[in-house]
Regions:
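C-terminal catalytic "cap/lid" subdomain
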Residues: 1-148
Length: 148
């Protein structure tokens, strides 16, 4: 029921031309929801899915999702299926926030399962938004299912 209410509220805002900015740490935090979302990455994926967004871009301080390959980690450009091993590669928190890569991977799973295109991209890149949608930078997570 809460998800449906959230979805309806978002839809009404979008129809009015309002782009809602939601931060779990501020406007929607209530004691009853502690642990419900985890952090803003996961909350953004839930909101993108509820709003039937086409895209979710997570802007961060790294170029995307890296995996170890010997001396130098490899940037994955496209991740079609997330595995438990991929999530295990992620630990710790980012320098600019509390979620770290693990929460971004969880958000990618939620978004892609909800039919939303998702990318993790370095927000300091001059063309971060346009180039991530064009898949020139970052890590892209295609939707795993089509929305009805």
């Amino acid at each position: 029921m809460r998800y449906k209410n959230l979805q309806n509220a978002l839809q009404q805002l979008l129809e009015l031309g309002v782009v809602p900015i939601v931060n779990e740490n501020d406007s929607v935090w209530v004691p009853e929801l502690v642990g419900a979302f985890g952090d803003n990455d996961e909350l953004s994926a839930l909101l993108a899915t509820a709003a039937h967004a086409d895209w979710l871009l997570l802007l961060t301080e790294v170029d995307g999702f890296y995996v170890p390959t010997g001396k130098h980690p490899k940037l994955l450009r496209t991740v079609r299926k997330l595995t438990p091993q991929m999530e295990e590669l992620c630990n710790g928190h980012g320098q600019l926030g509390t979620g770290g890569m693990r929460s971004k991977i969880r958000a990618a799973k939620t978004a892609s399962e909800g039919g939303v295109h998702m990318a993790i991209v370095n927000g300091r890149h001059a063309h971060a938004i346009l180039w991530s949608i064009a898949r020139k930078i970052g890590t892209y997570f295609p939707p795993r299912r089509r929305r009805s």
